[in-house]
Amino acid sequence: MAKKLLRVVKLQLEAGKATPAPPVGPALGQYGVNLMEFCKKFNAATADQAGTLLPVEISVFEDRSFTFIVKTPPASFLVKKAAGLKSGAKEPSKEVVGKIKRKQLREIAETKMQDLNAKDLDAAMKIIAGTARSMGIEIED
């Protein structure tokens, strides 16, 4: 018989650096999940992407077991990384804090394609370009 799903918990964690401290502890501890087991499995699965912020979807079952799916990094994280910035603009419509090339935009769209609601690469590029604009980052040709 299949396990009964208790809850799906969504977190954003730095790859290879999950610890039982917040945010992992409070989010999973209330469902009785073995925190060290989750941290070891997550860190092992994401060790090759160290330093990257990754969304993770953790399915917790009634018997306190779990499975998790690691998604691609958020578009805003990838855009900031491509532009070499720590954060976006305070007033995006008024100030430009950085620029990225169309080639970088295409690479980000290819990376995010599986998680985006887009049928083709051009649509994905438009979504990522909108994210960049909302952060005060211009797209160069």
From Swiss-Prot:
One of its GO terms (molecular function) is large ribosomal subunit rRNA binding. Pfam families: Ribosomal_L11 (PF00298), Ribosomal_L11_N (PF03946). One or more lysine residues are methylated. GO terms for cellular component: cytosolic large ribosomal subunit. InterPro entries: Ribosomal_uL11, Ribosomal_uL11_bac-typ, Ribosomal_uL11_C, Ribosomal_uL11_C_sf, Ribosomal_uL11_CS, Ribosomal_uL11_N, Ribosomal_uL11_N_sf. Keywords: Methylation, Ribonucleoprotein, Ribosomal protein, RNA-binding, rRNA-binding. GO terms for biological process: translation. Part of the ribosomal stalk of the 50S ribosomal subunit. Interacts with L10 and the large rRNA to form the base of the stalk. L10 forms an elongated spine to which L12 dimers bind in a sequential fashion forming a multimeric L10(L12)X complex. Belongs to the universal ribosomal protein uL11 family. Forms part of the ribosomal stalk which helps the ribosome interact with GTP-bound translation factors. NCBIfam families: L11_bact. PANTHER family: 60S RIBOSOMAL PROTEIN L12, LARGE RIBOSOMAL SUBUNIT PROTEIN UL11M. This is Large ribosomal subunit protein uL11. The lineage of its organism: Bacteria, Thermotogati, Thermotogota, Thermotogae, Petrotogales.
